[in-house]
């Protein structure tokens, strides 16, 4: 459910480091998210949209669970993310982020979220 994306290359020299983060997909929307400590974000799923999260700063607990017929199903998966971590969330995976520290990340989406008809769906049960 929470797919860790590994670097596809890393080069280091006297100038510093250069890392390849993402070399797949057709991504349509990029967002910068800054969140204070002890805040919950998300707790929703998408029917069509894939999302990548690139953690730039802080520590974030992400919880995920599959959705079937608008209900949480199966085991809950939880990961602690820190600076440099990159994850992929597929459609029909409810995902909730809880910031353990003041955090900043880039959110990359495969679809543009339309204000009049967003691909954001919520359920009544809480993951956190």
Language-model features, listed with the residues they occupy:
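His/acidic/aromatic-lined binding-pocket segments of jelly-roll/cupin-type domains
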Residues: 44, 50-56, 79, 96-97
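A short, N-terminal "cap"/entry segment at the start of jelly-roll beta-barrel domains
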Residues: 1-28, 42
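Short acidic-glycine-tyrosine-enriched beta hairpin
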Residues: 67-91
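Conserved short histidine dyad/triad with adjacent acidic residue
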Residues: 31-49
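Structural motif
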Residues: 59-61, 86, 102-104
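Tight coil/turn sites that cap or link beta-strands
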Residues: 36-38, 83-84, 90-92, 102
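Double-stranded beta-helix
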Residues: 3-10, 94-128
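Glycine- and acidic-residue-biased ligand/ion/polar-headgroup-sensing regions
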Residues: 48-68
């Amino acid at each position: 459910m929470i797919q860790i994306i590994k670097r596809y290359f890393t080069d280091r020299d006297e100038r510093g480091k250069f890392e390849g983060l993402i070399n797949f997909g057709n991504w349509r929307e990029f967002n910068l998210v800054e969140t204070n400590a002890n805040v919950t974000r998300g707790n929703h799923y998408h029917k069509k949209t894939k999302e990548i999260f690139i953690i730039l700063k802080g520590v974030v607990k992400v919880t995920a669970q599959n959705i079937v017929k608008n209900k949480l199903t199966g085991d809950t998966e939880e990961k602690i993310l820190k600076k440099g971590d990159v994850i992929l969330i597929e459609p029909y995976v409810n995902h909730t982020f809880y910031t353990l520290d003041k955090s900043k990340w880039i959110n990359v989406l495969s679809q543009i979220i339309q204000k009049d008809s967003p691909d954001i769906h919520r359920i009544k049960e809480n993951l956190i």
